Amino acid sequence: MNIVTGKQESVYDLIRSMSKAEKRNFKLYATRLSGNQEAKFISLFDCMDALDEYDETKILQRCPIKKEQLPNMKAHLYKQILVSIRLLDAQRTVPIQLREQIDFARILYDKGLFRQSTKILEKAKEQALFYEQYTQAIEIIEFQKRLGTLSVSRGLVAKSETVSRQVAELCTRIKNINELSNSGSQLYGLYLKLGYTRTQKDIDLIIQVYGQKLAKYEACDEGELSFTERFFLYQANAWYNYILHNLLLCYKYVCRQVDHRQQRPERFG
């Protein structure tokens, strides 16, 4: 019989990563469920939580589970743990809160309660824009457009134009964030692969590919860039100057990034 020990196992790794509060919340969540199947996966959770390393032999000895049942039980446990963590994090994680509000709005929409759906979406959009969750903000606006077509009014055309401009602006924000975060990641990857630039040819190449791109954003006024755009700009500039061995400038941008982050610590959980 092929028994696995010391193997990387997704559900075991997830359990080991859980905080005490998350484990306690899972146990409370699990006890609300009923049935023999649920009792088995709670037993599996307790067994895995007690192990110092993943060991199927010990699991099968200690849990009322047959070997052929184990894969399905682990998959079920994995899903239920994620559900319980999602419920716990819903009150403190903005993207999860927004996802929940969008889902609520969709339920109301499907039931024909358009006014209630619109009210929830408006609050969710305000929250998404405040926390710069632009992808979800666009999803909300597109949903609002669908609701808007159900109420014909004189102001519909003007409102439609405003919404289109807002979506275009958010798409630009997302494009900028992706470009800046990708630049930082690419520069970090180059440093790991090659280290500091050693020749003038390497220096010229880095400046040509990344210098002009970052300078374009540096030229923007303070209010032109969002909090997230500016954060990734500082991060990319730090790696840009580090790989060029401009350590004083690198230090300057690292300090800016730290100061910038401290302005809105709630953005980083």
Please describe what each predicted stretch is.
Residues 1-113, 149:
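Intrinsically disordered, low-complexity protein-interaction/activation regions
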Residues 18, 102, 108-110, 116, ...:
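Hydrophobic/aromatic side-chain positions at a characteristic register within alpha-helices
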Residues 91-99, 138, 145, 177-181, ...:
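Start-of-helix signal in alpha-solenoid helical-repeat scaffolds, especially tetratricopeptide repeats
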Residues 104-110, 142-151, 183-203, 231-246, ...:
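Tandem amphipathic alpha-helical repeat scaffolds
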Residues 114, 134, 154, 247-248:
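TPR-repeat structural position
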Residues 122-130, 165-172, 208-222, 254-266:
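Amphipathic alpha-helical segments of tetratricopeptide repeats
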Residues 124-153, 261-268:
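Short, charge-rich amphipathic alpha-helical segments embedded
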